[in-house]
Amino acid sequence: MALSLGLGLALSALVIGIRPQVVVPFGLSALGSALLGSLLIPGLRRWKAGQVIRQEGPQSHQKKAGTPTMGGISFLPVGLLVAGIWSGWDPHWLAVALLTLAYSFVGWLDDWLVIRQQSNKGLSPQHKLLLQVGVALGFCVYLAWQGIPTSLTLPGIGTLSLGWLFWPLALFVLVGTNNAVNLTDGMDGLAAGVVAILLIGLGLLHRDPELSVLAFTLSGACLGFLVHNHHRARLFMGDTGSLGLGGALAGLALLGDQLWALALMGGVLVAEALSVMLQVGYFQYTKRKTGTGQRLLRMSPLHHHLELGGWSEVQVVGSFYGVTALLVGLGWAWWHWTGM
């Protein structure tokens, strides 16, 4: 944890040195998010908007049942609003804001059904995927209307023209990032902290100053949310928060030609998603071959595998913060060294 704190301080110093103009909106977002969360928690408790914990998860998590959820409504609007004011309501800001809110609404609907039914089954996987793809298609229409280059830039390598293949890739990034953040949101402070650090990385590299500010204000909003979400959490972001953050990350990366940065700096999100896909794929493969499904991991996603291996939540979260900070530093150094 000390290493993670040191890396975080070093990253903050880097940000202040390179982008001093984002310090005020970053701070306002953090403060506003923390204050709004404080006001929201009592209301969510009165409305009995408590988290339902799935029985298949680690048994140690059952004690978290009833913790207020839907916390995404306490920080996403703050980060979006501060960025909107700072950017003068820039059209690209509006597009990413609408994308974020649309995915957040899908998540809110899922959270609401979970609370209403008092089970961990909200939207069916099919309905959820259909809504996610629908939102992604809408954003792709905006990208095409804006004439976004259908290419992929790799620092030190060059620009690869993808043509029509760019659009399936964009859909995959939008839906995949959504689900990756959602899967990562399984421990106190994990998703909020990892995404906060990742947003700083995207903000440092973004060529669009308005979208750079948006990345930093959303990062600040995540930081303010962590006041209530760190171990032991008093508020969960729910799908309301995780799907919204996933949409914001994907939108920022697509508009800034930063898919490489999202993949590299978001390595923790990639690992979490891959761990689930490998676990499910291996289980189904061995079940077909032997009649008995076997598992690669103790439990997926990866953070639960480590937890069941004896790691504490604080150790897992601190390690993932540290890895993300290192990947952000590596991505920034690669981008800077190649002169991109």
Curated annotation (Swiss-Prot):
InterPro entries: Glycosyl_transferase_4, PNAcMuramoyl-5peptid_Trfase, PNAcMuramoyl-5peptid_Trfase_CS
GO molecular function: metal ion binding; phospho-N-acetylmuramoyl-pentapeptide-transferase activity; UDP-N-acetylmuramoyl-L-alanyl-D-glutamyl-meso-2,6-diaminopimelyl-D-alanyl-D-alanine:undecaprenyl-phosphate transferase activity
EC number(s) recorded for this UniProt protein: 2.7.8.13
GO CC aspect terms: plasma membrane
A Gene Ontology biological process term: cell wall organization
Recorded family membership: Belongs to the glycosyltransferase 4 family. MraY subfamily.
Protein name: Phospho-N-acetylmuramoyl-pentapeptide-transferase
Originating species: Synechococcus sp. (strain JA-2-3B'a(2-13)) (Cyanobacteria bacterium Yellowstone B-Prime)
Lineage of producing organism: Bacteria, Bacillati, Cyanobacteriota, Cyanophyceae, Synechococcales
